[in-house]
């Protein structure tokens, strides 16, 4: 499978989002959700998804940047989806560069379906 990576930078100026319109694209937990997210990632620059995260998110580091489920639920949190490959989605977390690999992590598809709450894409972006 080919990897697809979009531009997502933790240090990017987000003024281009000022007039953006949010479009919800899914809120179910099926394998079709994964395929829909991949299709939309090809068409749009900016995807966000909300997850019911757990303690395993705090284990994500430079050495271990693949998310794993662990412990109790900590509530909802949104991240940017930047790409995917055969291992899962590449995400950018806004917790800073101390999270995962300089702010990035891989979210395996099974964990995506387990913790997924909603997804959205933005239109009318002015760069």
Segments (PLM) and residue ranges:
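Predominantly the structural core of cysteine protease catalytic domains
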Residues: 1-92, 97-127
């Amino acid at each position: 499978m080919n990897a697809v990576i979009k531009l997502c930078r933790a240090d990017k100026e987000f003024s281009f989002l000022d007039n953006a319109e949010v479009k919800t694209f899914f809120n179910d937990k099926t394998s079709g959700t994964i395929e829909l997210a991949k299709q939309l990632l090809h068409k749009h620059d900016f995807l966000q998804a909300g997850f019911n995260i757990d303690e395993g998110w705090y284990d994500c580091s430079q050495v271990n940047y693949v998310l794993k489920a662990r412990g109790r639920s900590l509530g909802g949190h949104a991240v940017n989806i930047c790409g995917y490959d055969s291992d899962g989605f590449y995400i950018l977390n806004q917790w800073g560069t101390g999270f995962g690999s300089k702010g990035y992590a891989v979210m395996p598809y099974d964990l995506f379906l387990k913790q997924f709450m909603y997804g959205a894409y933005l239109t009318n972006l002015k760069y």
